[in-house]
Design a protein with these regions (language model features):
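N-terminal amphipathic alpha-helix/helix-capping segment at the start of soluble metabolic enzymes
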Residues: 1-21, 25, 30
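Glycine-rich anion/phosphate-binding loops
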Residues: 31-37, 89-103
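Alpha-helix-loop-beta-strand connector modules within alpha/beta enzyme cores
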Residues: 61-86, 127-149
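Hydrophobic faces of well-ordered beta-strands that scaffold small-molecule active sites
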Residues: 16-22, 51-55, 83-88, 112-114, ...
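Glycine-rich, proline-tolerant flexible connector loops at the mouths of alpha/beta enzymes
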Residues: 22-31, 47-69, 116-126, 182
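Catalytic cores of alpha/beta
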Residues: 94-105, 158-168, 182
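Internal, glycine-rich beta/alpha segment that forms the wall or movable "lid"
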Residues: 117-174
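Acidic (Asp/Glu)-rich catalytic clusters
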Residues: 6-11, 40-48, 69-81, 101-109, ...
């Protein structure tokens, strides 16, 4: 069985997705709660309109709140988890990453985007390249559709080579057209 996201990507026509970031960690309890409430409203509004929502995980090196726990606990039963696609970076221990994927699958998420994470900041990656983590996750959770990322700041022909490789281990990939890092 493929994820709703993968099925939608294969269909002709337009597909709109949105990437959101959880609140940064270190906020006061009140600020954190307000941020999560605002984010939750956005997620619910988009997902109910059949828009896929990707929620990042420390992708740019800023400490963020853990996304999976929030999504599972707070979005509500009227929001299909098939429309929500959490990110997982390699910037955690391998044990955390594998358990995260197990949790995602057991909670009912159909897809997970696994990316390396910014090597210039924050904790080190548990594996050198995200495809290695996707391979490990695939062994444990073969029913979870996995995605990757093509880096728009690297050589484009090399990025295409990576995503076209059999060991990329992903059913979908993302990239950025415009970046706030540029």
């Amino acid at each position: 069985m493929t994820a709703a996201l993968v099925d939608s990507l294969r269909r002709p026509g337009r597909l709109i997705t949105v990437e959101l970031r959880p609140p940064r960690s270190g906020l006061s309890a009140a600020e954190g709660m307000d941020s999560w409430i605002d984010l939750n409203h956005s997620i619910r509004h988009l997902a109910i309109k059949d828009i896929f929502v990707f929620l990042t995980d420390d992708a740019v090196g800023s400490r963020e709140e853990e996304n999976l726990g929030h999504l599972a606990a707070n979005v509500g039963s009227d929001v299909p988890l098939s429309r929500l696609v959490p990110f997982l970076t390699c910037k955690h221990t391998i044990e955390h990453c594998l358990l995260y994927a197990d949790r995602a699958h057991s909670l009912g998420f159909e897809a997970l985007t696994v990316v390396g994470g910014d090597v210039s900041t924050g904790p080190p990656r548990c594996v050198p390249h995200s495809y290695m983590l996707r391979q490990r996750i695939r062994e444990r959770q073969p029913g979870l559709s996995l995605g990757g990322w093509a880096n728009p700041h690297r050589d484009s022909s090399k990025q295409v080579e990576y995503i076209g490789s059999d060991d990329f281990s992903a059913e979908f990939y993302l990239t950025q057209i415009v970046s706030h890092h540029s």
